[in-house]
């Protein structure tokens, strides 16, 4: 039986980003729609920097109910929302938008809780974990706060040091976060997270290869299809890591929390991770 609160008409949800042709989000939300018995469609829109704002605003003006934002527009979408949650105000990064009953566009971010869910599922993270994050873009802004809430000690490695410094200065009041430097080349990190978009273009980010040990947990927030490793994870495996995972679990978890924001129903995350793995 369809959820009576949303049975009047089909609900329009969307994904905005670039690139998007690889995205599994439409498939995930198709499964969610069946599970929670709410009839919503989920369409993808390829955007450019010049038309992103226009396309998203047109979507909401023409009956759009909610949307996800992916790379490279998570920081830009902060400028679209006219109301934001506390965490979004901290991170200045949005991956979920929802139109409220009084026509406000409210910004949320589910990347951080999605990542923590998956790192807990994999048993990768504990309080006080030493974590190296590769990258300093919108995806990193989305996840750092939740890692600091776990009392993790974070180091940021990015090819542009000034961007790392800006990020660190923004979040240092919430916990231990530092810019990676050459004095850490022999440091043993508990987790190394690739939060760059390099995998979308089929290459691994550059990082000191001597940081990989057999027990180093390597995590890529990107994911790959057909059970192939992402370029980053392939590199880590070849360097000797025995523990590595892509971000498929994070993707499903953040999507489920997005669904909860839109419809106040949380799909079964574990079941949908297993379902997706069996399909792709």
Swiss-Prot record:
Catalytic residues (UniProt): 74
E.C. number(s) listed in UniProt: 1.1.1.25
GO-annotated biological processes: amino acid biosynthetic process; aromatic amino acid family biosynthetic process; chorismate biosynthetic process; shikimate metabolic process
A Gene Ontology term for the protein's cellular component: cytosol
Positions that bind shikimate: 23-25, 70, 95, 111, 223
Record-linked Gene3D superfamilies: Leucine Dehydrogenase, chain A, domain 1 (3.40.50.10860), NAD(P)-binding Rossmann-like Domain (3.40.50.720)
Pathways per UniProt: Metabolic intermediate biosynthesis; chorismate biosynthesis; chorismate from D-erythrose 4-phosphate and phosphoenolpyruvate: step 4/7
Residues noted as binding NADP(+) in the record, renumbered to the chain: 135-139, 158-163, 221, 247
Keyword Amino-acid biosynthesis: yes
InterPro entries associated with the record: Aminoacid_DH-like_N_sf (IPR046346), NAD(P)-bd_dom_sf (IPR036291), SDH_C (IPR041121), Shikimate_DH (IPR011342), Shikimate_DH-bd_N (IPR013708), Shikimate_DH_fam (IPR022893), Shikm_DH/Glu-tRNA_Rdtase (IPR006151)
Keyword Endoplasmic reticulum: no
Top-level lineage group: Bacteria
Name of the top EC class for this enzyme: oxidoreductase
Record keywords: Amino-acid biosynthesis, Aromatic amino acid biosynthesis, NADP, Oxidoreductase
MF GO annotations: NADP binding; shikimate 3-dehydrogenase (NADP+) activity
Catalytic activity: shikimate + NADP(+) = 3-dehydroshikimate + NADPH + H(+)
Family: Belongs to the shikimate dehydrogenase family.
Subunit structure: Homodimer.
PANTHER family listed in its UniProt record: BIFUNCTIONAL 3-DEHYDROQUINATE DEHYDRATASE_SHIKIMATE DEHYDROGENASE, CHLOROPLASTIC (PTHR21089:SF1), SHIKIMATE DEHYDROGENASE (PTHR21089)
Function summary: Involved in the biosynthesis of the chorismate, which leads to the biosynthesis of aromatic amino acids. Catalyzes the reversible NADPH linked reduction of 3-dehydroshikimate (DHSA) to yield shikimate (SA).
Protein name: Shikimate dehydrogenase (NADP(+))
Origin species: Buchnera aphidicola subsp. Cinara cedri (strain Cc)
UniProt gene name: aroE
């Amino acid at each position: 039986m369809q959820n009576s609160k949303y049975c009047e008409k089909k609900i329009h949800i969307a994904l905005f980003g670039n690139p998007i042709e690889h995205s599994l989000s439409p498939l995930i939300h198709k499964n969610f729609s069946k599970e929670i018995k709410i009839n919503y469609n989920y369409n993808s829109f390829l955007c450019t920097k010049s038309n992103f704002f226009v396309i998203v605003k047109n979507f909401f003006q023409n009956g759009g109910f909610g949307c996800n934002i992916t790379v490279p527009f998570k920081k830009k979408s902060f400028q679209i929302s006219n109301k934001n949650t506390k965490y979004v105000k901290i991170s200045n990064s949005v991956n979920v938008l929802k139109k409220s009953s009084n026509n406000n566009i409210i910004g949320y971010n589910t990347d951080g809780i999605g990542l923590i869910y998956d790192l807990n599922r994999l048993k990768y993270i504990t309080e006080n974990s030493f974590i190296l994050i590769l990258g300093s873009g919108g995806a990193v802004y989305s996840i750092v706060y939740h890692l600091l809430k776990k009392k993790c000690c974070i180091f940021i490695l990015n090819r542009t040091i000034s961007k790392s410094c800006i990020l660190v200065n923004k979040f240092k009041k919430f916990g231990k976060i530092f810019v990676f430097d050459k004095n850490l080349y022999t440091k043993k990190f508990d987790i190394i997270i690739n939060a760059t978009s390099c995998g979308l273009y089929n290459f691994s980010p550059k990082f000191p290869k001597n940081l990989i040990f057999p027990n180093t947990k390597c995590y890529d927030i990107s994911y790959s299809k057909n059970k192939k490793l992402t370029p980053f994870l392939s590199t880590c495996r070849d360097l000797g890591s025995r523990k590595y995972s892509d971000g498929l679990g994070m993707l499903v978890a953040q999507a489920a929390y997005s669904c909860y924001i839109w419809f106040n129903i949380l799909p079964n995350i574990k079941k949908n991770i297993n379902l997706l793995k069996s399909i792709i």
